[in-house]
Amino acid sequence: MSDESQINQENQKETRKKDDSPLTTDEVIKDKGKVDFTKGGVENYKFYPDNPVNHRHKYRWSMKEPSKYYDPCEESRQASINCMLRNQEDKTVCQDFFDAYKECKKDFFNKKVADRRQGKGGWGIW
């Protein structure tokens, strides 16, 4: 392998690392060791794996058909459903999952309202 091709490959790797910022990727981090629940300080604690303030949710929300349902907190929703299926006798065990899903949805709709107040379009006709 020539030196020039090695340099090109290294540059591509560096570019990919830079492009993996939260705004450019929709990847859900599933490895618990890599999730930063306290990103930005104590006031920004995050108790769910989804990223409801990602800019891509706005476009998916506006591009969905009127009769379709879009959930930006899909992973939290699925976790709460799985907990209910595991603990059918006692739903109080799943309260943390319910709260995380509710918080995720609240963050998503707060982002939506904030974008509208700032005059940012893209949320559909409403």
Swiss-Prot record:
Q: Which UniProt keywords apply?
A: Disulfide bond, Mitochondrion, Transit peptide
The record's annotation in InterPro entries points to:
COX23, Cys_alpha_HP_mot_SF
Domain CHCH span(s) in chain numbering: 70-112
List compositional bias (Polar residues) regions by residue number.
1-10
Which superkingdom is the protein from?
Answer: Eukaryota
Q: List the disulfide bonds.
A: 73-104, 83-94
Q: Where is the composition biased (Basic and acidic residues)?
A: 11-29
The record's subcellular locations are: Mitochondrion intermembrane space
Q: Where is this motif: Cx9C motif 2?
A: 94-104
Which PROSITE patterns does UniProt cross-reference here? Answer: CHCH (PS51808)
Question: Looking at the UniProt record for this protein, which Gene Ontology cellular component terms does it annotate, in alphabetical order?
Answer: mitochondrial intermembrane space
What this protein is reported to do is described as: Required for the assembly of cytochrome c oxidase.
Q: Which family does it belong to?
A: Belongs to the COX23 family.
Q: What is the protein's name according to its record?
A: Cytochrome c oxidase-assembly factor COX23, mitochondrial
